Swiss-Prot record:
Outcome reported for the amino acid change (mutating residue 207 to A): Impaired tail-anchored protein insertion and a shift from GET1-CAMLG heterotetramerization to formation of heterodimers but does not affect recruitment of GET3 to the endoplasmic reticulum
GO molecular function: ubiquitin protein ligase binding
Protein name: Guided entry of tail-anchored proteins factor CAMLG
Pfam families: Get2_like
Length: 294
């Protein structure tokens, strides 16, 4: 197959060589059409116009109405492609193409804007919903904690008011002079026993044993004898310390047990004071009356 020369700028087309079959002629014509179409596209893009292309322009103007009808039936992307390529040919067909392209371009822009705005709105709505849910999740524990703290504060305030009323009611009874009720029979027995023990220790035992060993033995005996003595009713005294402990959240049972322990320690300390004071007093009397007494 001989090489076929390309089309010149003047628009002259070389004749097809003779002696070719029908299929070869068809292929040659297709190739020439493709070359011409590519040249025309390049010239349109670059802005060149061939002077001898009047007949071709007429053919193009005739085919433009058909192209406009096809454009109306085609989709939006095909219209946009043709608008980008664009024809530099003047005439009514070009005006129609421009109008169609503008209308379709505006429609395309509106649709694209709607498609773009819809995901943005949905994303904004989703972000707002997430922020609201997060805010609700973070607000729920804070509200619960504040509600719990408020309830605790109110309960403690009520307890403080009750303790205040109890303190006010107990003060007149203490001022009336009913202190004799505090000393029961067992308490008096303890004090008398400590004084007698101090006398006996000073008279007979101080040479051989420590003065505190008999006292500890007596306290152990008191712990066993406490069961056999009648128990008087103990009035629970409400003090500022107990009120403060209750308001701080310590249970009342723990406070009562601690108060009982402190009262027992106070009794033991009182017994020790009586015992030691009696012992020293006896010792001074013996030294004053008889210097020879050991």
């Amino acid at each position: 197959m001989e090489p076929v020369p390309a089309a010149t700028d003047g628009g002259e087309r070389p004749a097809t060589p003779s002696g070719l079959s029908a299929s070869q002629r068809r292929a040659e014509l297709r190739r020439r059409k493709l070359l011409m179409n590519s040249e025309q596209r390049i010239n349109r893009i670059m802005g060149f116009h061939r002077p001898g292309s009047g007949s071709e322009e007429e053919n193009q103007t005739k085919s433009k109405p058909q192209d406009s009808d096809k454009l109306n039936s085609l989709s939006i992307p095909s219209v946009s492609k043709r608008v980008v390529l664009g024809d530099s040919v003047d005439g009514g067909g070009a005006d129609q193409l421009g109008g169609v392209a503008e209308v379709r371009g505006t429609q395309l822009g509106d649709k694209l804007d709607s498609f773009i705005k819809a995901p943005e709105c949905s994303s904004k709505d989703g972000a707002e919903l997430r922020q609201r849910t997060r805010g609700d999740l973070t607000a729920d524990p804070a509200q619960r904690a504040s509600h719990h703290g408020l309830e605790q504060y109110l309960s403690r305030f009520e307890e403080a008011m009750k303790l205040r009323k109890q303190l006010i009611s107990e003060k007149p009874s203490q001022e009336d002079g009913s202190t004799a009720e505090e000393f029961d029979s067992f308490r008096i027995f303890r004090l008398v026993g400590c004084a007698l023990l101090a006398l006996g220790v000073r008279a007979f035992v101080c040479k051989y044993l420590s003065i505190f060993a008999p006292f500890l033995t007596l306290q152990l005996a008191y712990m066993g004898l406490y069961k056999y003595f009648p128990k008087g009713e103990k009035k629970v005294k409400t003090t500022v310390l107990t009120a403060a402990l209750l308001l701080s959240g310590i249970p009342a049972e723990v406070i009562n047990r601690s108060m009982d322990t402190y009262s027992k320690m106070g009794e033991v300390f009182t017994d020790l004071c009586v015992y030691f004071f009696t012992f020293i007093f006896c010792h001074e009397l013996l030294d004053y009356w008889g210097p020879e007494v050991p």
